[in-house]
Amino acid sequence: MGIQTATASDVAQHTPMMQQYLRIKAEHPGTLVFYRMGDFYELFFEDAEKAARLLDLTLTQRGASAGNPIKMAGVPHHAVEQYLAKLVKLGESVAICEQIGDPATSKGPVERKVVRVVTPGTLTDAALLSDKNDVYLLAMCVAHNRRGVATSVGLAWLNLASGALRLAELAPDQVAAALERIRPAEVLVADTPGDAASWTPPVNAGALTRVPVWHFDIASGTQRLCDQLEVAGLDGFGAHSLTCAWGAAGALLLYAAATQGQQLRHVRSLKVEYESEYIGLDPATRRNLELTETLRGTESPTLCSLLDTCCTTMGSRLLRHWLHHPPRESAVAQARQQAIGALLEAPPGAGVDSLRGALRQISDIERITGRLALLSARPRDLSSLRDTFIALPELRAQLAAVSPNADSLARIDASLEPPQACVELLRRAVAEEPSAMVRDGGVIARGYDAELDELRDISENCGQFLIDLETRERARTGIGNLRVEYNKVHGFYIEVTRGQTDKVPDDYRRRQTLKNAERYITPELKTFEDKALSAQERALARERSLYDALLQALLPFIPDCQRVASALAELDLLAAFGERARALDWVAPTFSPDAGIEIEQGRHPVVEAQVEQFIANDCSLTPERKLLLITGPNMGGKSTFMRQTALIALLAYVGSYVPARRAAFGPIDRIFTRIGAADDLAGGRSTFMVEMTEAAAILNDATPQSLVLMDEIGRGTSTFDGLALAWAIARHLLAHNGCHTLFATHYFELTQLPAEFPQAANVHLSAVEHGHGIVFLHAVSEGPANQSYGLQVAQLAGVPNAVIRAARKHLAYLEQQSAAQPAPQLDLFAAPMPMLLEDADDERDSKAEALVPPAMQALVERLRGIDPNDLRPREALDLLYELHELAAAPDADH
């Protein structure tokens, strides 16, 4: 049994301070306790060992308690944020235990309490948060039938930094996609026994925290949510069909409030999300399209990194949300594109550039508001909030010139009206450039509080008093080099050099002796010292009290601050979209109620930004042309063409302009991709199993309004199995799903599909051979490709020439055999077919030799017998003529 899990009787054996620590630790099991002692946060026992390992701290042992040495590790209080950030990144939670009692008046250990708990999903401090990423805490409540099988899952997730709360209720098989979209930092689940849990969260759920089952009670959750939102019922939020989502919301709010140690004053609204509201993007699609993260796990180059020229971090975070939540309703996208068009067509002084210049002066008031609601806002948060509000009139004046041309801009303009009472309060109360921390003083503006001003005057007039006293004492004592000074250790003093001490008056009292001087204090100086130091301490205490009262006074303005923050984020993102459209030559797409996708001269937005020249291509998918069979060489651009089609469609529905000459879209409900594959070792699935699982999801869920991207389906198994599966899948997509499909393949047998299904069409990526090499044209043309150029691509990849030669010879053999008679399916364990070995062994295979003309054999033999280093110039010239004659022989042309 560890010392931290000691029983009550064991605790009594410890020192009073350790008893206090163990009681606090018992209330926070599984959490590192940062226990404040003076200027340090200390960790003890197992916590100390763990923190020393994770944070690379020195582990020490000091003294003993209950007969055991006390293991300790500590971090300075002024640098605690950097340690918290590292621990949270590692998925740890930390309880911050502060001294709340006065050491001077405490009997026994100073009173301490946990003031907040920092967990991966409840971050609000600027030092712990990524500027451009939201952090979500999510709770998951599972409903079961009588047999214990999960039937539905209620989700509630909260961005504590902004106060945004959302709910959803899904089928169990939809949860993985939802978690991929939300990306929660921490997930709350019921702490149920392992044998009673019939369903466990997916592996991408984030840091798991188990809480008591009763936290998820649906009735209690409903009441807790009503209390939080200050409403009598929840029907007004469009959530009448939910059940277990209420339980998830209750557990979420209970946990979040407990970690903060106070009410969540900024959580005042609720949004219920339904699957039908957004274009469906499964986890594979989000990864393959590289919306916010590359396949290598980096943030650039991605669609988000290309689009993110936002001037505020609020706009950057909203961009990520929009990319992962493209609305199905085209009216939303059209409204955004109308706003972008109005900004691009605005008169000078009111367009994209001027608005973006004004937006650069805006602070992250969304997160400032969150900290204000939790009473953790720092002085510079308040000055930033004030300065942002002061800058709004200029921004609104520019916006007024274009807002009549777009309903979205008019709505944003109206939402940018700052709360004037809040602005005036901040103007009066907060210093122009306040200190970083309240404890440093200089936070409250002069003129706001008469008592504080008086105390400051006493403290700040010390300099003049000391100058006057020094002048008087020099005249009184006749000591010309006498000095009156102050330091934090000894306070105020009069310094006299050792050679002048005989002139010191009787009322001087020695305070400190130095090597070459003596320091004294007089009754007058002592009286002033008491008054000045007392005034400084009282001023800091008064300022702390005023600051706390100011935070309370600002709480009623939180809804207004949230309204302004939301409008600023949207305006910033629309302006960024406008800047991207202009800089990258993008156009506004159009929408139609009729099914189809028409893209003229479309480009891949991310790839185009990485290369000097990009070949644009058309894509036409209509009710009469549902499936495009795409053939062509590897590296020819098939995957790029497919991805760019999906990205252009996604951008259109997000509300951005798109990289094309023209683009038109009908309704799209989901986008599926089956591009590339890797095995899932953790899940025990092979590459082919992953491929088939993704294909199954598409075949089961795709509708006539879905866009499907299929790349090289069936390649993970034997040739005929793969071909048969690819053929059947393509047929099913046409005959049953009826979805818009881009189907890339190397199975040329599939190019016969349009003969059976007129809704299928062949296109190919062009390439031309140059010697034994290949030049990719990256242009999409009608009709099937005539070959796949696999050997040329292998040569480009650096495959040794000997291997390429052997492959080329064996390819010729296979083609000859295929022309002569049908070839059996290749089998991994069958006896090898006759084939040419490398180098000298190649020539011993008579069947392969028969494919090479005699003159060409003679030419090769002659070349192999030449050592260029032994040739003289004349010999080299004669040899060149000889080789030319051999190559010109009639049967040498092969």
Curated annotation (Swiss-Prot):
GO terms for biological process: mismatch repair. SUPFAM superfamilies: DNA repair protein MutS, domain I (SSF55271), DNA repair protein MutS, domain II (SSF53150), DNA repair protein MutS, domain III (SSF48334), P-loop containing nucleoside triphosphate hydrolases (SSF52540). It comes from the Bacteria. InterPro entries: DNA_mismatch_repair_MutS (IPR005748), DNA_mismatch_repair_MutS-lik_N (IPR007695), DNA_mismatch_repair_MutS/MSH (IPR017261), DNA_mismatch_repair_MutS_C (IPR000432), DNA_mismatch_repair_MutS_clamp (IPR007861), DNA_mismatch_repair_MutS_core (IPR007696), DNA_mismatch_repair_MutS_N (IPR016151), DNA_mismatch_repair_MutS_sf (IPR036187). The keyword Nuclease does not apply. One of its GO terms (molecular function) is damaged DNA binding. Keywords: ATP-binding, DNA damage, DNA repair, DNA-binding, Nucleotide-binding. This protein is involved in the repair of mismatches in DNA. It is possible that it carries out the mismatch recognition step. This protein has a weak ATPase activity. The lineage of its organism: Bacteria, Pseudomonadati, Pseudomonadota, Betaproteobacteria, Burkholderiales. GO terms for cellular component: cytosol. ATP binds at residues 632-639. Belongs to the DNA mismatch repair MutS family. The gene is mutS. This is DNA mismatch repair protein MutS.
